[in-house]
Amino acid sequence: MVNRTSPMDGGAEDSPPEGHKWLKVNGVVVGTVPITGDPEMDLIVAREFLDKRGLRPPPPTKLQSMFRQAIAFATVSRDCHEMLNRQPRNPVYAAPFVVNIAFSIELYLKTLAEAHGVTPWGHDLMKLYEGLPGAALAALSKVTPHVAQSEGLAETSDVGDALANLRTAFVDWRYLYEKESTEMVHIPSAIFVARALHEACLASGIK
């Protein structure tokens, strides 16, 4: 392990040795590796360094990868929503918001189903929802009232009802410029669904 104040780095706390870069695991510096100038080779060198020291984190499971990707698309949709709310309003962010939140919902639904032993397919959100096993629906129903209330909606708000408005949104809104019109999306309901599914995934033990 390389100490940030060791002679190796010339005494500079924030600078690695010349021609090297810091290597971190979970935000902690564990050493330095040479910069080869080739990104792929740099990755190989870093992996070898970590493997030799038993520091390389285990790869995520399929379920973890699905959940993290759902979170990533939900995060992008949140950023688009923030842009939509800025003044003066710019409606150009509406389509990216809908596409990203719809896809995040699709991934959350598939993640939740996978966590309970079902591997679903397709983009139709209602079909994915209707295909959830009982245990997944139970996990979702437990978190729904609290999430609805936190989003300013009635505690009796239903995920299925909200999904009826979103079922083909991912497909319909990707090429919005090619259409004269498309079904409007109720933004608060879309956010409610994404958050409820996120919480249901957490409640199902997915991290």
Regions found by a protein language model. Give the residues of each.
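Alpha-helical scaffold segments that form or flank carboxylate-/histidine-based iron centers
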Residues: 91-103
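Long, charged low-complexity segments
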Residues: 4-7, 11-71, 117-207
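Short, surface-exposed helix-loop/turn micro-motifs enriched in polar/charged residues
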Residues: 89, 96, 117-121
